[in-house]
């Protein structure tokens, strides 16, 4: 077992010797004396407890151990440079255009105010914010970062969990005074259900779980819309039972204008940042994702505080 780890500067000395062909040439490249180069190689060999270089009148040659050390040294020094570049990059300010997409309801209520705050912190950024009522293709729709309320993310995208979320069943007290509250998922078929067709939702099918099982429930009613805001208004007016995100209905639950229906059931609808390229390649993308994660967690709860549905 090694008493200590090789130092990066000693690995650099070894690489320079191999590239230049001699101790003196390596010393000149490094701006050091030949004695310094000799000393660092001795320290490296002592650290690794092996001979790395054979010196002769014709020059220097790597031993078998030296060849392995040289190959690893190249990899280590490359990674070291990436580390330095990444840390140095953090000190600079992100700038340029970034295109962000989202659904209408969540985009208006949460992401738009978040972008306003983002621009206060990073005024060099330019943000184009576009709302969609459909699932989008990042390439075809020219979007750098899409905010999705949907756990089914294609494998060819990268996804970062912003916060956990669930959709819950709700109705106004006025509706439940007219019609008996359902006691099972099957009884939903006897009720006026307010059907929403948003980006990720199949029209008329509610996927509901209780932590032990998950069921697909076919529902119908006299009213349906592709706008969650309209469906929420209908529910408040006592028109039926709806399935909406908890962040959307929580104020009305607290005020008593809405009540939970079948509270043991919910639909997982976690909130994700979806993008194509790794975050380390783009500072503006990384800054936006990290900012939106902090924003959502501050207002909607941290990822480990959410509801997990089967």
Curated annotation (Swiss-Prot):
Tagged with keyword Lipid metabolism: no
Pfam families hit by this protein: HTH_1, LysR_substrate
Residue span, HTH lysR-type domain: 6-63
Entry keywords, A to Z: Activator, DNA-binding, Transcription, Transcription regulation
GO term, biological process aspect, one: DNA-templated transcription
Record-annotated DNA-binding residue ranges: 23-42
Matches recorded under SUPFAM superfamilies: Periplasmic binding protein-like II, Winged helix' DNA-binding domain
DNA-binding in keyword set: yes
A Gene Ontology molecular function term of the record: DNA-binding transcription factor activity
Family: Belongs to the LysR transcriptional regulatory family.
NCBIfam families hit by this protein: PRK09801.1
Job of this protein: Positive regulator required for L-tartrate-dependent anaerobic growth on glycerol. Induces expression of the ttdA-ttdB-ygjE operon.
PANTHER family with a match to the protein in the record: HTH-TYPE TRANSCRIPTIONAL ACTIVATOR TTDR-RELATED (PTHR30537:SF5), HTH-TYPE TRANSCRIPTIONAL REGULATOR (PTHR30537)
The protein's name in its UniProt record: HTH-type transcriptional activator TtdR
Species the sequence originates in: Escherichia coli O6:K15:H31 (strain 536 / UPEC)
């Amino acid at each position: 077992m090694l008493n200590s780890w090789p130092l990066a500067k000693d690995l650099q000395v070894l690489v320079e010797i191999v590239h230049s062909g001699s101790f003196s040439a390596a010393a000149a490249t490094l701006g050091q004396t030949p004695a310094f180069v000799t000393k660092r190689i001795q320290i490296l060999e002592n650290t690794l407890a092996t001979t790395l270089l054979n010196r002769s009148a014709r020059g220097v040659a790597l031993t078998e151990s030296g060849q392995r050390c040289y190959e690893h040294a190249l990899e280590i020094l490359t990674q070291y440079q990436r580390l330095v570049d990444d840390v140095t990059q953090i000190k600079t300010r992100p700038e340029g255009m970034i295109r962000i997409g989202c659904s209408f309801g969540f985009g208006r209520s949460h992401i738009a105010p978040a972008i306003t705050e983002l621009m206060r912190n990073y005024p060099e950024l330019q943000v184009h914010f576009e709302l969609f009522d459909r699932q989008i293709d990042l390439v075809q729709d020219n979007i750098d970062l899409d905010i999705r309320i949907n756990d089914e993310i294609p494998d060819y995208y990268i996804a970062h969990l912003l916060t956990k979320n669930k959709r819950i069943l709700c109705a106004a007290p006025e509706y439940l005074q007219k019609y008996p509250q359902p006691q099972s998922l099957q009884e939903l078929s006897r009720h006026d259900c307010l059907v929403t067709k948003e980006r990720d939702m199949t029209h008329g099918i509610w996927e509901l779980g209780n932590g032990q099982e998950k069921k697909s429930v076919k529902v119908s009613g006299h009213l349906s819309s592709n706008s969650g805001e309209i469906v929420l208004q209908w529910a408040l007016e006592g028109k039926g039972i709806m399935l909406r995100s908890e962040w959307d209905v929580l104020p009305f639950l607290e005020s008593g204008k809405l009540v939970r229906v079948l509270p043991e059931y919910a639909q997982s609808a976690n909130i994700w940042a979806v993008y194509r390229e790794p975050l380390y390649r783009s500072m503006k993308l990384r800054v936006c994702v990290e900012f939106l994660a902090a924003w959502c967690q501050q207002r909607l709860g941290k990822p480990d505080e959410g509801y997990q549905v089967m």
